[in-house]
């Protein structure tokens, strides 16, 4: 029995990699008549570390599009087992460095030793296209004393591309 479980785990890691999806990905239109806002949002465009040094930490990078203002945002939500106190996010898109400041206003203890840090960052269309259409995108979360690298954003990037090519044209 143990051999079968080990083999099954090994096959799963080979086919799905060390980062698994987190949550159920979807796209929703979030309209609020009280605030007169209308956003098209990715929900749960995340990866989760699994069976490595990043075990069970979740990294979400959702695109938000303000339909009324015709502007885009990156909603970054990091749920980890320890604090980074994120100050900035650095992407490498085919080697080109793209740096975003990260607000220190959005931090919380989720419970059970889990912490969350998030921000909604404005992003212009040219920069968004660089991230979406680059051959390889990596990311570094720079904290006050530490940093953390994500070297495989292919699942997130694939969903960005689908969102950009199929969902956004309906509202532009």
Which residue ranges define each predicted feature?
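Short, surface-exposed binding/anchoring microloops in extracellular/periplasmic proteins
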Residues: 57-87
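Bacterial Sec signal peptide processing site at the extreme N-terminus
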Residues: 16-33
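N-terminal secretory signal peptides that target proteins for export/translocation
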Residues: 1-2
